[in-house]
């Protein structure tokens, strides 16, 4: 549901751009992201940190586009977001016992640490590349082409990358069974209960 709402925001941006230009599209994007955050809060009483980051960047760069009447700000937003995410994946690669992608998915898939680290590194490279590619398109081609690339290009690349990730995980990982999850939770509870005071 969350992915569908995020995709809807991009689609609305694209449609409004075709109807009334970049500034109306930017305003529509800000509204859609705000609505997504409000919806998630009222439904779950919690907003993931990724949604907060997206909201802050959209407000900053979208707001700057509207205030200064310069579309270059909103064109930078996807790249900044990708590079912020890349920094998070990279930091987890250097600090801590588990990389970020393992923390996100190891309750569903069991894989050796080496493969989690490779997958995490792949995310870093992909996010850095897609951020750079966004700026290349923004500065090299027309605004209309960039808007189309934002919807079809970046989204298409992300879907292809996720397919590749799923293929890699299917080769090197195994699905975590419900019984194993329950056993892990029971063991954790017993450890807490039996710890010395």
Curated annotation (Swiss-Prot):
Top-rank taxon, per record? Bacteria
Key word Ion transport present: no
Broad class of where this protein is predominantly found = membrane
Check the record and name the InterPro entries matching this protein.
YciB
Compartmental location? Cell inner membrane
Q: How does it sit in the membrane?
A: Multi-pass membrane protein
Record Pfam families: IspA
The record's keywords, sorted A to Z, are: Cell inner membrane, Cell membrane, Membrane, Transmembrane, Transmembrane helix
- Indicate the transmembrane segments per the record: 22-42, 48-68, 76-96, 121-141, 144-164
What does UniProt give as GO cellular component?
Answer: plasma membrane
Which family does the similarity line name?
Belongs to the YciB family.
The free-text function statement in the UniProt record for this protein reads: Plays a role in cell envelope biogenesis, maintenance of cell envelope integrity and membrane homeostasis.
The protein here is known as: Inner membrane-spanning protein YciB
Q: Which organism is it from?
A: Magnetococcus marinus (strain ATCC BAA-1437 / JCM 17883 / MC-1)
Q: What is the organism lineage in this UniProt record?
A: Bacteria, Pseudomonadati, Pseudomonadota, Alphaproteobacteria, Magnetococcales
Query: What gene name is given for the protein in this entry?
Result: yciB
């Amino acid at each position: 549901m969350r992915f569908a709402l995020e995709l809807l925001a991009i689609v609305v941006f694209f449609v409004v751009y075709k109807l009334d230009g970049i500034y109306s599209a930017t305003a529509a994007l800000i509204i859609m992201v705000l609505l997504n955050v409000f919806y998630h809060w009222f439904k779950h009483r919690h907003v993931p940190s990724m949604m907060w980051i997206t909201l802050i960047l959209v407000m900053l760069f979208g707001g700057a586009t509207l205030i200064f009447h310069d579309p270059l700000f909103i064109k930078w937003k996807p790249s900044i977001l990708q590079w912020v995410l890349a920094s998070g994946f990279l930091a987890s690669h250097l600090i801590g016992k588990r990389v970020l992608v393992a923390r996100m998915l190891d309750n569903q898939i069991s894989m050796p640490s080496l493969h989690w680290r490779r997958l995490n590194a792949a995310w870093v490279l992909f996010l850095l590349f897609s951020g750079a590619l966004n700026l290349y398109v923004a500065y090299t081609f027309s605004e209309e082409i960039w808007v189309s690339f934002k919807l079809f290009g970046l989204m298409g690349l992300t879907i292809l990358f996720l397919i590749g990730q799923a293929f890699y995980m299917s080769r090197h990982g195994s699905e975590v069974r419900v019984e194993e999850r329950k056993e892990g939770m029971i063991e954790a509870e017993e450890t807490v209960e039996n710890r010395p005071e």
